Amino acid sequence: MEVPGKMTYRPRLLLFLFGILPSLGAEYKSDNFRVEAPSSAIAKELGEAAEQCRKEQALAWLDKELPPWPQPCLIEVRITLDGRGGCSTFAFDKGKVTSRSIVLEGSLETLRTNVLPHEIAHSIFADYFGCPLLRWADEGGAIVSGCDTDGRWYNKLCHEITNTPGRSMLLRRLLSCRDYPDDVTALYAQSYSLVKFLVDSKGKPAFLAFVSRGMQDHDWDGAVRAYYGFHSVEQLERAWLREQKEILLATPLLQRGSTKED
């Protein structure tokens, strides 16, 4: 049933999921999380990791710690033999998150180092904006919050996509993209590369302020001028793509050809 004034937001899975999903057999509770996992040891490990990740990412993105959430975030953990993925669900009302939950699937090591930081970043953004975030900013920021291996893979992929006629999105279109396009991989790759460029330029808090302004008045040229000193979205795009090419040329050939780890 739909409730007027409330929105539920479900970011798409980061990757396709594989394997058999075991039943959830144990629970661990912390100040901000309730973790359901196949064993008490796994539940405790990921619950503690989630609290630490929440603190670190809030400091990185917001320059401050978050207050305790009114309701704990449910994390469902499913250990799988192959593949990995994550999904975050939020309900919003009057600019606030009213409920949140996370599903994690993959090996324990991958969940701790890759998937959990990605999903916690979505939650940090949900608190900051109080509404569904534009896809490029949400997914790009979440990937930036993850491991360096993912970042290198997406950077290489973005270069391939931008050099494939008809596959990449112009930056002006990407900035206003609210729904996942048919080519989700291209969205993820371009979004990561762009967010990394902006974060490296002025930092994470400035990036969030930039996105907030752009979302409020839809004047991305004005937001670009105010926060990054470029005259237009197109000038930013040229600088971003030029740096992306320079990064690829400076990357050792062995790393360029590496494949993404599941």
Regions found by a protein language model. Name each.
Residues 1-9:
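N-terminal secretory signal peptides that target proteins for export/translocation
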Residues 25-134, 151, 220-223:
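Juxtacatalytic substrate-recognition/specificity segment
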Residues 16-25:
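Hydrophobic h-region of N-terminal signal peptides that target proteins for export
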Residues 80, 89-99, 107, 111, ...:
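Acidic/His/Gly-enriched intrinsically disordered linker/tail segments
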Residues 5-6, 18, 257:
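A detector of low-complexity, intrinsically disordered, Ser/Thr/Gly/Pro/Ala-rich segments
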Residues 8-16:
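Sec-dependent signal peptide recognition
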